Amino acid sequence: QKVFRDFAFVIDEKYSSGEIISLVQKINKKLIKAVKIFDVYQGENIDSGKKSIAFNVTLEPKDKTLSDNDIDQISKKIISVVQETTGATLRS
């Protein structure tokens, strides 16, 4: 059963969409089936030199149904890896 989660970060404009996709996919290749960017924005309410990037992650386990806790854990991992690697901030 597939699970979808959306994330949005404010990130330095030097990072490409491809770099973010690659970074997230590497977190758990068995579980993360797809990462799709659905919005990139620069302008009002975003600091100069930064951009907002929003993406959807598809989780699809092969051997079990994900519990809410499993989903929370992988979501927290995605957030921490993106923040630690790029200095991004989570956008609410």
Question: Where are the predicted features?
Answer:
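A carboxyl-terminal module marker
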Residues: 1-92
